[in-house]
UniProtKB/Swiss-Prot annotation:
HAMAP family: ClpS. Belongs to the ClpS family. Binds to the N-terminal domain of the chaperone ClpA. NCBIfam families: PRK00033.1-2 (NF000669), PRK00033.1-5 (NF000672). Pfam families: ClpS. It comes from the Bacteria. Involved in the modulation of the specificity of the ClpAP-mediated ATP-dependent protein degradation. This is ATP-dependent Clp protease adapter protein ClpS.
């Protein structure tokens, strides 16, 4: 027989605990982090005298996933009130959508302006 065959290993499978805490009677609980909702931003379209209404409806359908009826209502609000909110998003998404709309409008040679504003 080999010398190693007589060795017996015993593993402690209990969770490690400090006996000092038990003796002191102190209960310890980890602090749970509190999560807050990120600040939201409005994406706003502004009226101008040159951008066709159909183009504004197209922008609302393509970039904001609005159906034709809702896109038309928002377009009419932009036309009559001078501006309208297209959606409410976190900052990164709002900035991206505004940039995409402005870039698409410039490529299509329209002066349509889209900006973001902090909600609240």
């Amino acid at each position: 027989m080999h010398a190693f065959s007589k060795i017996r290993l015993t593993f402690n499978q209990d969770s490690p605990q400090s006996h000092e805490d038990d003796a002191a009677g102190i209960a310890v609980q980890d602090a749970k982090p509190t999560l807050q909702a990120p600040p939201m931003y409005k994406v706003v379209l502004f009226n101008d005298d040159y951008t066709p209404m159909d183009f504004v409806v197209e922008v609302l359908e393509v970039f904001f996933n609005l159906n034709r009826e809702l896109a038309t209502k928002v377009m009419l609000a932009v036309h009559t009130e001078g501006r309208a909110v297209c959606g409410l998003f976190t900052r990164d998404i709002a900035e991206t959508k505004a940039m995409q709309v402005n870039q698409y409008a410039r490529e299509s040679q329209h002066p349509l302006l889209c900006e973001i504003e902090k909600d609240g």
